[in-house]
Regions:
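Bacterial N-terminal signal peptides
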Residues: 6-16
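N-terminal pre-domain segments of enzymes
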Residues: 18-69, 356
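N-terminal cap/lid segment of alpha/beta-hydrolase-fold proteins
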Residues: 54, 67-117
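Cap/lid segment of the alpha/beta-hydrolase catalytic domain
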Residues: 115-201, 245-250
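Primarily recognizes the serine-hydrolase "nucleophile elbow" in alpha/beta-hydrolase
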Residues: 191-263
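Mobile cap/lid helix-loop segments that gate and shape the active-site cleft of serine hydrolases
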Residues: 234-279, 298-308, 316-320
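Conserved strand-to-loop "acid loop" that flanks and positions the catalytic carboxylate
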Residues: 284-301, 330
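C-terminal catalytic histidine-bearing segment of alpha/beta-hydrolase fold enzymes
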Residues: 309-356
Length: 356
């Protein structure tokens, strides 16, 4: 991670497309947008919301750094390292090119079929674990985390990448040019969608994302920046910054997250140029299913319950109020089977997939 990017003036100069960070903005007030003079206007139409959404994405990039250009991307050059038969699928251990000098390790589940059938596909993002992608397999070692395996059994093509620096992904944040590990993750996950769309058995218009904890918010972030993702499931993945450990956002500031939240915004939630009210709303009108347990000590459900009604106003404006779903299981930081099963049914419905 290029530490020069933590200097605010240089950072702003390197982001000519991003305006100065907003001040005094209520990030929960979703149905207003600001014109170039800073004056507020009500969001009444789809076109108005497009302006507000653009400002949300801009605010995210002020904290995360800019999304790198996706023009002239290198070939994916997928390499198969290992192959194993599973329950109706073949599981491949692969790596592929995300950008120059970087190959991303991943697991790829490909359903067995006697003839080519176009299928829906899933980006399955793992929680924090030294196992990385293997945490979401049948033998991941923790109950209620095998969603990559379970979705493959349902007939989906599934890709489960490592997030830097977990699993087999020996990534050096100090050596890259990203402002944040979060943005590197977003770029990688968009490349995973590229790979899924390159497969002959994948219907490119039927792709979803799912994750727990680290994977939960990474699924959301990927969904904001990549509208090819049609349904997003997040377990224990988010709460507004003021509700994250009572507003202590230090946990968001490591290299693999967003260092600018500390170095530029002084660990002050009021200064961070985006919040999860906006991030969730930016997924609209696509299906978003949030599992937010009552006893999750990381991501306080009280904040989630404040944010969902605000985001639903946007979903309602876009004619998809029921596409936003919240479940609050009575458990701690977990993804219980009954909620997973319900989430899978929402994925099936959103992507038109019949369970095998």
């Amino acid at each position: 991670m290029n530490r020069l990017f933590t200097a605010p003036l240089l950072f702003a100069a390197l982001l000519p497309g991003l305006t100065a960070e907003p001040s005094g903005i209520d990030h929960s007030n979703l149905l207003v947008y600001r014109d170039p003079s800073g004056d507020e206007h009500p969001v009444k139409t789809h076109a108005d919301w497009a302006k507000r959404r653009g400002q949300i994405v801009e605010g995210m990039q002020q904290a995360m750094g800019p999304l790198p250009s996706r023009t002239a991307l290198p070939p994916l050059d997928m390499r198969v390292r290992e192959q194993a038969d599973g329950d109706g699928f073949t599981r491949l251990s692969i790596d592929f090119v995300t950008e120059k000098n970087d190959r991303l390790p991943a697991l790829l589940y490909r359903p067995k079929a006697k003839r080519l059938v176009k299928r829906a596909a899933i980006l399955a993002l793992h929680p924090t674990s030294p196992l990385g992608k293997h945490r979401v397999t049948k033998k991941g070692g923790v109950p209620n985390r095998a969603y990559a395996y379970e979705l493959a059994k349902r007939g989906y093509v599934v890709i489960a990448p490592d997030y830097p620096p977990f699993g087999d992904y020996k990534y050096d944040f100090e050596a890259d040019d990203y402002v944040s590990g979060t943005m590197k993750g977003i770029f990688n996950h968009m490349r995973c969608v590229d790979l899924l769309q390159s497969l002959p058995e994948v219907d490119p218009g039927r792709i979803g994302a799912i994750g727990h904890s680290l994977g939960g918010h990474n699924a959301i972030f990927a969904g904001v920046f990549d509208t090819r993702i049609r349904v997003i499931v997040s377990s224990c993945g988010w709460t507004p910054f003021h509700d994250y450990y009572g507003g202590n956002i230090r946990g968001w500031t490591s290299d693999r997250y967003m260092p600018l939240l500390k170095t530029r915004y002084g660990l002050d939630p009021d200064r961070v140029p985006f919040d999860f009210y906006e991030v969730v709303a930016a997924l609209a009108p696509r299906v978003f299913f949030s599992s937010s347990p009552l006893q999750d000590s990381n991501f306080d459900v009280r904040g989630v319950k404040k944010a969902i009604p605000k985001a639903r106003e946007v979903y309602r404006l876009l004619g998809q109020a029921d596409a936003l779903q919240l479940r609050t299981p009575d458990c701690a930081h977990d993804f219980p089977v009954e909620v997973r099963d319900e989430a899978y049914r929402f994925i099936d419905q959103a992507l038109g997939q019949a369970e095998n």
